[in-house]
């Protein structure tokens, strides 16, 4: 594995924001592009995959099914599924816990959690917004 590739966990809100955006130069779209270009390595769990599928297929978003399938297929083919150790941590939104558990898992070296809901998580240098991630690691 290439040591220059960042290990990441991507919160669902980042994917939703990227899908909703009509601009190619916004941070959420740039993060998704880095993923599709294999410039970042995605880690996920069964719970995270289930949330991706559930949220991205919600009728209210009216996302193109091909785009949703492209993302889910990418996750399944290129992402790395893990079963993280359960953490007894109180987060503002309990649905964020699976993402936090992955980024905190000791088996993943120097992972980053990319989220649009930074306030939902403890303040840690490896938990960042899409804009912060792009500023640090480039487009």
What is each stretch, according to the model?
Residues 14-15, 48, 99, 119-120, ...:
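Alpha-helix capping/helix-boundary segments
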Residues 1-44:
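Short, well-structured N-terminal submotif of metal-dependent ribonuclease cores
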Residues 108-139:
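Acidic, PIN/NYN-like endoribonuclease modules and their adjacent C-terminal/linker elements
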Residues 89-95, 119:
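Acidic, metal-coordinating catalytic cores used for nucleic-acid/nucleotide bond scission
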Residues 32-87:
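PIN-domain endoribonuclease scaffold, especially VapC-family toxins
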Residues 22-25, 30, 58, 126-130:
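Short, glycine/charged-enriched secondary-structure capping and boundary segments
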Residues 17-19, 55, 124, 136-137:
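Residues that scaffold the ATP/ADP-binding catalytic core of kinase and kinase-like folds
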Residues 93-114:
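Acidic, metal-associated active-site segment
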């Amino acid at each position: 594995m290439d040591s220059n590739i960042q290990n990441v966990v991507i919160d669902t809100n980042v994917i939703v924001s990227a899908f909703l955006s009509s601009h190619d130069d916004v941070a959420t779209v740039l993060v998704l592009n880095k993923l599709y270009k294999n410039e970042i390595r995605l880690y996920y769990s069964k719970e995270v995959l289930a949330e991706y599928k559930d949220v991205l297929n919600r009728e209210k978003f009216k996302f193109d099914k091909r785009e949703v399938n492209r993302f889910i297929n990418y996750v399944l083919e290129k992402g790395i599924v893990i079963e993280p150790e359960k953490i007894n941590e109180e987060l503002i939104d309990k649905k964020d816990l699976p993402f936090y558990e992955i980024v905190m898992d000791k088996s993943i070296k120097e992972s980053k959690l990319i989220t649009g809901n930074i306030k939902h998580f403890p303040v840690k240098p490896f938990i960042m917004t899409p804009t912060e991630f792009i500023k640090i690691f480039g487009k």
